[in-house]
Amino acid sequence: MSVPSWSKRLLNAVHGALIFRRRVESLADRLAIAIPSDAIRVLDLGCGDGQVAWALMQRRPELVIEGVDVLVRPETQIPVMAYDGATLPFADQYFDCVTIVDVLHHTDEPARVLAEAARVAAGSVVIK
């Protein structure tokens, strides 16, 4: 027996408003502490639609966050560039910090993703 479409919409709305939003806020709180205080330019690797980065910038307004993702959504909260999952389209040490949140388990080559993050980071790579 299938779930009626109205109940799916209701479930998605409740999940988005209560559970997902709380998760975004919690992640932003933790990242705001984990990112070094002298960082300005930050790359959110695997940023999705950029909600976590946007919430992070509310806590740390000095941060300028760009994102990359293998799937660029039609609407994003931050500037997002397409990423092939292998080579980041940035020069060495281009960012002060790179964040990787819930991404590595989706990759075929996590070591390569980490190496690329380290290459474009002048400072820290923050992984969750």
Model-derived regions: residue spans:
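Class I SAM-dependent methyltransferase SAM/SAH-binding core
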Residues: 43, 49-87
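A conserved beta-strand element that flanks and buttresses the S-adenosyl-L-methionine
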Residues: 99
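N-terminal, positively charged/glycine-rich alpha-helical extensions of SAM-dependent methyltransferases
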Residues: 1-10
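Short catalytic micro-motifs in class I SAM-dependent methyltransferases
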Residues: 102-103
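A short glycine-rich, Lys/Arg-flanked "PGG" loop and its adjoining helix->strand segment in the class I
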Residues: 111-125
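Structural signature of beta-strand start/N-cap positions in the alpha/beta core
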Residues: 41, 64, 94-96
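Alpha/beta-hydrolase-fold catalytic nucleophile elbow
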Residues: 128
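Conserved alpha-helix/loop element of class I SAM-dependent methyltransferases that forms part
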Residues: 19-38
